[in-house]
Amino acid sequence: MAAALGNDYLVAPDVVVYRDLYEDSEINADQLIVDDEICKMADIRKSNGGKPVLHASVSAKYTMRSDRAQNSRTEALNLIRNRKGHLPHIVVVTAEPMPNRLASLALGTGDIDCVYHFALYELIRVVKEVGSEDAVETLETLVQGKRLKDISDLPLDLSV
C-alpha cells in the first residue's frame, strides 16, 4: 500500500521462472528412484503436495545507473533471504553500453549469478574498434570470469 501511495518503493523481480513438479512416473521413467517409502519430502515430487519451485529470477534493466544496479541486488537478496530450498538462478539482463557500469554489477558480491547483455558481441567489437584499453580489459575480465555473457546464452544457462 505504501508503495502505491508513493511513500515507499517496491522492489520486485521483472521475470520469475518456476519449475513445475514431477509425477513419480516421470521420475521413475528409466528406473525406480522414488516410491511411497522414500523421498517423502522431496520438493520436486508432485505427490508430496508442494508448489512449483522458483527456478530463476530475471531483473531487466535497460541501463545500469547505480540505483538500478542496487535494485537488482536488493531483488536478489530478498529472494535469497526468503527462499526455502535451493537458491534460484538470479540474473540481470541489460543493454548497458558502458563496461565500467556493467562491471559494477557483474563483479559484485556474488548475489547475482551473471549479467546478460543483449548485444555483447557487438559491444566487444565496438569497444575494440574505439581502442579503449581499460574498457577492453574490463569486458575481457568479465567474460573470462563468466560474470558477463550474451543474451543468447541465457536459455541454455537456465535449462540446468
PLM regions and their residue ranges:
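Active-site metal-binding core of divalent-cation-utilizing nuclease and nuclease-like domains
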Residues: 1-48
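Short, well-ordered amphipathic alpha-helices
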Residues: 15-20, 73-80
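Active-site-adjacent loop/helix micro-motif of nuclease/hydrolase catalytic cores
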Residues: 25-30, 63-75, 86, 100-103
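Short, flexible loop/turn elements at secondary-structure junctions
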Residues: 19-21, 61-64
